[in-house]
Design a protein with these regions (language model features):
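Alpha-helical scaffolding within the catalytic cores
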Residues: 56-57, 90-100, 194-201, 219-231
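Short, surface-exposed basic-aromatic patches at helix termini and helix-loop junctions that form
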Residues: 100-102, 175-185, 234
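Metal-dependent polysaccharide deacetylase catalytic core of the NodB/CE4 family, i.e.
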Residues: 30-32, 64-173, 237, 242, ...
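His/Asp/Glu-enriched short active-site or ligand-binding loop at hydrolase and phosphoryl-transfer sites
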Residues: 182-222
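Catalytic grooves of carbohydrate-active enzymes
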Residues: 12-14, 18-31, 152-162, 168, ...
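A solvent-exposed, charged loop/short amphipathic helix patch at secondary-structure junctions
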Residues: 30-52, 124-135, 251-276
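Short, small-residue-biased leader/transition segments that mark boundaries at the very start
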Residues: 1-7
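Catalytic domains of carbohydrate-active enzymes, especially glycoside hydrolases
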Residues: 15-28, 38-71
Length: 286
């Protein structure tokens, strides 16, 4: 290197986002179905009691200890109906309990779905990758409007503007519905990395006014690839964006057999590393 190239006069700068967000997908939501044998093994509790007395208490402890904020993405029900014949959720006690605690902790309520069926049109063939159903456009509109109504009924006078696609799957047709029919939604938080039917994004303000903000890493199985992705995103945009599902503890592919104690420890290790590595990173909601 020449002395000219190495001169301290040559300093470059560029704008960064400077924000850290932790998403809770499927939260608040009804108690999910799934194999709770590892929850039973480790805690001798059913799934509902485990979420209330263990998982949520632990997640809130990270708020108290590290100052992070959660954006919860609501699922109204886990039914498979995509006909557009929507109905309101009658059992709201868990939504109110968890949602209000989330808000009081400095968090935010967002939208995930009327159910957990991605907004994909009838013309889409999942080719066996997913067993999800598909929608007519009018049914998508009905379902999303019901979700907005439901959230507003439970959490009035609270801004709710973030949409998280179920399984990070969102079609062009579904996105069009969000933009044209659901004015409450101002931003979509999906995935930075491409995958089967994934709605992958860059950080940007789209020409139609929607804010695109991808999530970078997920869960409590934070392998070398995820750690590299997290480090790279801090370098590029000075951003952390992580999401986790409560039902990771029920899904072997997401670490259920390891047990919540291990997943929790991995997550806390990441949060602690983040705080020590980037102490000036702002704790934000989506």
């Amino acid at each position: 290197w020449s002395s000219d190239v190495c001169s301290s006069d040559l300093v470059a700068s560029y704008p960064v986002i400077n924000g850290s967000v932790f998403y809770l997908d499927d939260f608040p939501a009804p108690v999910p179905s799934g194999d709770g044998k590892y929850v039973k093994r480790d805690y001798n509790l059913n799934v509902a009691d485990f979420y209330t007395n263990i998982w949520w208490v632990d997640m809130l402890s990270f708020v108290d200890k590290y100052g992070i904020k959660y954006t919860g993405a609501t699922i109204e029900n886990y039914e498979d109906d995509t006909s557009g014949n929507v109905h309101g959720q009658d059992d709201i006690s868990r939504f109110v309990y968890f949602g209000n605690m989330l808000l009081r902790s400095g968090g935010e309520i967002g939208y995930h779905g009327y159910n957990h069926q991605p907004l994909s049109p009838k013309s889409l063939d999942y080719k066996g990758v997913y067993s999800y159903h598909t929608w007519e456009e009018s049914a998508m509109v009905s379902a999303m409007k019901e979700l907005v109504r439901f959230n507003e009924e439970l959490f009035p006078n609270v801004e709710k503007s973030v949409y998280v696609p179920p399984s990070n799957v969102l079609s062009a047709e579904g996105r069009k519905v969000l933009v044209e029919e659901i004015p409450e939604i101002k931003t979509i938080a999906s995935s930075y990395f491409p995958g089967d039917f994934a709605y992958d994004q860059e950080f940007e303000w789209a020409s139609d006014g929607m804010v695109e903000q991808p999530r970078i890493i997920s869960g409590g199985m934070l392998d070398d690839f995820m750690q590299l992705a997290a480090f790279s995103e801090l370098n590029m945009h000075f951003v952390n964006s992580h999401f986790i599902h409560p039902d990771d503890t029920l899904d072997v592919d997401r670490g259920a057999e390891l047990g919540w104690a291990v997943l929790k420890s991995n997550l806390e290790h990441y949060i602690s590393w983040l705080k020590s590595s980037a102490p000036d990173l702002r704790d934000l909601t989506g």
